[in-house]
Structure formats: structure tokens, C-alpha cells
Amino acid sequence: MLDIKITINGVTPLICNKFTDKAALAATTGVSSNNRGEPLTPHEQAEEKLYMDKKKACIPQPNILASIIEGGRFHKIKNRSVTTMQKSMIPSCFDIKGIMLPIKTKGWEVDERPVRIPA
């Protein structure tokens, strides 16, 4: 086996939306609790959505692998897509070590621009 160390550099803001226990409860029971306390600042809201490991921002390994697999739809090998609707060649080629991959940064700021996620 060959180990290769890579660094992924983003060119656009990173959108994180961790699936919390509160969201899981709302999804399974259909009931969401309204927090009637003080409204959270944008920074506090964003902090709740971050994946954290040892008090540092990170990304789960399955999320990175799924992103790479999805990106395979746009790459072809001999006129054949690396990833199709049903299967992908990518998991047979490599794996990513670790469970939570650190986001190495000097800090972060909240991007408060409105986001439209296409359906």
C-alpha cells in the first residue's frame, strides 16, 4: 500500500451543517422544540453547525470521501464516468485515513450572505 499525504485548499466558503441530536429528534418525531431564550449571534449559530474534534474544527472522513465520489461524475476514463448513479470506481482505488479530518486554519469568520441551495 502507498501512503500519500494531500492538502485540500478551498476556493469558496465552506458550508457546514452538522446533523445534531436536536435535528435527529425533530426528524424522527416530527416535533421540533423552540428555544425561546436569547437569540444566538451569527457566530454562535455557525459554531453549532461545525463538526468539532478536541475543540478544533474538522470534517468527517465520510463527508470528504462522498464529495470525491460525487466529483467523479465530472471525470471520465476512456469515455466512461468515474462515478455513475449506481456505482463508483473511486472506493476501489483509495481510502482516507482517519475519522475526523482537521481543518487547519488560523481562524474562521461567518459568511452572512444569503444562500440558495438548488432543489
Give the location of each predicted region:
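RNA-interacting cores
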Residues: 1-119
